[in-house]
Regions:
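Membrane-inserting effector segments that mediate pore formation, membrane fusion
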Residues: 69-126
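A sequence-composition feature that detects small, non-aromatic residues
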Residues: 35-37, 64, 78, 84, ...
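Amphipathic, membrane-active segments
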Residues: 109-160
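Generic structural signal for short, flexible, solvent-exposed coil/loop and linker residues
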Residues: 3, 14-16, 81, 87-88, ...
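Membrane-active, amphipathic/fusogenic segments and juxtamembrane/transmembrane anchors
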Residues: 1-73, 132-139, 147-149
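Surface-exposed beta-strand edges and their flanking turn/coil or helix-capping segments
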Residues: 40-42, 76-78, 152-157
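Generic detector of well-ordered alpha-helical segments enriched in charged/polar residues
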Residues: 48-55, 86-90, 111, 150-157
Length: 160
């Protein structure tokens, strides 16, 4: 399992984009750090599928940061790129299972994509986890196997 954890202060960036810190699960754009406006946000194309899966299978609505968007990045690669997801501290605190449910949905999605294919697939995902300090988040960047994704639950719980 290959992952990297960064401490970020996103409050200033959110102010620049005229956005507020979400308090629930939210898809983050790939270009959050570099976009000039929320209309420039680019999301991973798998966000559309995952949004439907979260809603249909788990009754979880996950909005995109900045709401509606028309810009999606599609990659032609053997690797699987998942959308960045923000976890609000209040949601993690109030609903202890939200992390494991979310990671299971992501793992199952990747597993379904890999059915019938040969070779090893690598998953890429960024998770933003709000900390107790206002506007501060920990960004967990994961690159690894499908099975390793489920183990991120322990890593995230240790970060709180």
């Amino acid at each position: 399992m290959d992952y990297k954890i960064e401490d970020l202060d996103i409050s200033q960036r959110l102010d620049e984009l005229e956005l507020t810190l979400p308090d629930s699960l939210t898809f983050f754009p790939e270009n959050f750090d570099t976009a000039n406006a929320k209309s420039d946000f680019i999301f991973t194309d798998s966000m559309l599928d995952l949004s439907k899966i979260f809603l249909q299978d788990n009754s979880i609505v996950i909005p995109a940061l900045g709401q509606d968007t028309e810009l999606y990045r599609s990659r032609k690669s053997a690797d699987i790129y998942l959308p960045a997801i923000f976890f609000g501290l209040s949601q993690i605190t109030e609903n202890q299972t939200i992390l494991s449910v979310s990671l299971n949905v992501l793992s199952n999605y990747i597993y379904d994509l890999c059915k019938g294919t040969s070779g090893k697939k690598t998953a890429h995902v960024d998770l933003y986890i709000e900390t107790k300090e206002k506007g501060k988040v920990k960004k967990l960047s994961y690159k690894g196997s499908i099975n390793g994704l489920k183990d991120l639950d322990k890593v995230i719980k240790a970060m709180k």
